[in-house]
């Protein structure tokens, strides 16, 4: 479980979006197997979110990163870029928790983090559940929420009211991160884990106090832990 350090506003550390030419140069670096700094990763993912990369270029970026293995500073930089571009979410006066997983195990499992979050909420824990539809599994958090008949796109003010009253709200990644619309078709077509499996849990727009995160690959634990530290979480 990770605790957020509010003294380190990671979103404010995002680099400006790279120009189309700069983004293409950084893409070539990744395809050639080179590592990006946090600032470079932030810039290229800000450009991706702004629609500067084509679907083919986006697929090449995601595939190349996954093939050689994402680095902590690359994940932190990409997360900073998307948090910077996210829809604002109000601060609250009570502790917030998210129960989330990376997904991406590739064996068609079902989503259990949403159920775990609802159980926690029934015990009085305020859960700001952030999630999306399934990419490589049978169900994602958003699929579960929709099946339960709950609304996917809730206004931030309403979400805060639900947290105070019911101890649970769902923050749909596509609604809070409009920049992700540029990558959703590519992720669906690739149907394989990408950096976005890690980014999803790290870009919750709510100001979390604690986060419980499941990781499908034990080999990624150290990398994700280091990325979380770089994002100011304890």
Language-model-derived ranges and their functions:
Residues 2-108, 123:
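Acidic, glycine/proline-rich low-complexity segments that act as flexible tails and inter-domain linkers
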Residues 60, 95-98, 125-128, 143, ...:
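Structural motif
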Residues 156, 218-221:
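Amphipathic alpha-helical transducer elements in NTP-driven molecular machines
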Residues 158-215, 225:
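Phosphate/diphosphate-binding glycine-rich loops and adjacent basic-rich segments that engage nucleotide
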Residues 222-234:
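Oxyanion-binding "anion nests"
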């Amino acid at each position: 479980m990770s605790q957020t350090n509010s003294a380190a506003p990671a979103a404010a550390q995002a680099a400006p979006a790279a120009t189309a030419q700069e983004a293409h140069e950084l893409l070539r670096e990744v395809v050639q197997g080179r590592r990006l700094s946090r600032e470079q990763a932030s810039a290229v993912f800000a450009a991706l979110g702004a629609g500067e990369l084509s679907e083919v270029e986006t697929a090449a970026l995601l595939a190349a990163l996954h093939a050689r293995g994402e680095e902590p500073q690359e994940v932190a930089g990409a997360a900073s870029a998307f948090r910077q571009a996210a829809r604002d979410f109000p601060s609250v006066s009570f502790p917030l928790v998210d129960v989330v997983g990376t997904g991406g195990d590739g064996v068609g499992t079902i989503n259990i983090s949403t159920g775990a979050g609802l159980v926690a909420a029934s015990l009085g824990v305020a859960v700001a559940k952030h999630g999306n539809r399934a990419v490589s599994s049978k169900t994602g958090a958003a699929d579960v929420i929709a099946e339960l008949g709950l609304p996917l796109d809730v206004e931030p003010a309403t979400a805060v009211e639900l947290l105070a009253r019911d101890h649970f709200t769902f923050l749909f990644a596509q609604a809070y991160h409009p920049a992700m619309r540029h990558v959703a078709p590519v992720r669906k077509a690739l149907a394989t884990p990408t950096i976005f499996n890690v980014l999803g849990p790290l870009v919750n727009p709510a100001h979390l106090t604690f986060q419980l995160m499941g990781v499908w690959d034990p080999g990624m634990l150290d990398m994700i832990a280091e990325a979380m530290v770089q994002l100011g979480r304890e």
